[in-house]
Amino acid sequence: MTIDSGFNHITVLLDEAVEALAVRADGCYLDGTFGRGGHSRLILSQLGSDGKLLGFDKDPQAIATGQALAAEDGRFVVVQRSFAELGAEVAERGMAGKVAGVLLDLGVSSPQLDDPERGFSFMNDGPLDMRMDPTRGVSAAQFIATAPVEEIARVFKEYGEERFAGRMARAVVERREIQPFERTADLAEVLKVANPAWEKGKNPATRAFQGLRIHVNNELGDLEAGLEAALEALEVGGRLVVISFHSLEDRIVKLFMRRLVKGESDNLPRNLPVRFEAFVPKIKIHGKAQFASEAELKANPRSRSAVMRVAEKLR
């Protein structure tokens, strides 16, 4: 467990993810989602003096933690960039095709969720922000204030998988005409009233808040770009380890890996002559999807939705 500003963060699938990387003492590794450094610290403990670890994060608080770690350990460097941009960063550092492993631990961290000032949670009232990097992009409040009802409904439905997206979006637009949304609790209350069928054990605002967060941070677009960039960065034999926390993320990861196991042949038109190489797999998948153990679920209930998938680059 790492402590940050009074907020606890327990790294999910810590040992399993680092074991899946098969860390080599002299290898170069990327932690695409540094967070509070749980995975990075364990990777560093397995690296030798010639090993290197490059961490990425958009969150300024995570970067501050990373800079403190970098000051202690010269093998580690942290950069304030999305993992979607890791291709550019790796190229700038002359590391393209030389990376032994990439780890992506997706979603929002406990310190982000639990800090009311970040605006991620409907459980704790705070400014309606939701940005991983509060200095860039459009906040959730700004999006809600200006987006057409159809766009808000699309975000709730596509990214939150909310079946009452249209009804909830209309309630949001009706209310914003009277008073703009500035606080998470305010939005959560309107969504709660507009949701006619509450799921047992789940706050009625859960799915809509997820949709907003994913949209504000372009999480699925970043994931698609990051997966492609990670594959290009890896050396042959390098490992890609991805931990996702909801079905939309996991679907993207699963389809990406399945496509590359089949080579490029699936993407070509029928009856088109192709080279044999088009049928040669680019990766192999290591084992089945892995989930948190009973012991981890008991210690950290937020791990219940975690799914880990592992692939190795073949060419």
Curated annotation (Swiss-Prot):
Catalysed reactions, as listed in the record: cytidine(1402) in 16S rRNA + S-adenosyl-L-methionine = N(4)-methylcytidine(1402) in 16S rRNA + S-adenosyl-L-homocysteine + H(+)
GO BP field: rRNA base methylation
Keywords, comma-separated and alphabetical: Cytoplasm, Methyltransferase, rRNA processing, S-adenosyl-L-methionine, Transferase
Principal EC category: transferase
SUPFAM superfamilies to which the protein is assigned, alphabetical: Putative methyltransferase TM0872, insert domain, S-adenosyl-L-methionine-dependent methyltransferases
Location in or out of the cell: Cytoplasm
SS bond list: none
GO cellular component, one term: cytoplasm
Segment forming the signal sequence: none
EC number(s) recorded for this UniProt protein: 2.1.1.199
UniProt: S-adenosyl-L-methionine binding residues: 37-39, 57, 83, 105, 112
One annotated GO molecular function: rRNA (cytosine-N4-)-methyltransferase activity
Chain's role: Specifically methylates the N4 position of cytidine in position 1402 (C1402) of 16S rRNA.
Assigned protein family: Belongs to the methyltransferase superfamily. RsmH family.
Protein name: Ribosomal RNA small subunit methyltransferase H
Lineage start: Bacteria, Pseudomonadati, Pseudomonadota, Gammaproteobacteria, Pseudomonadales
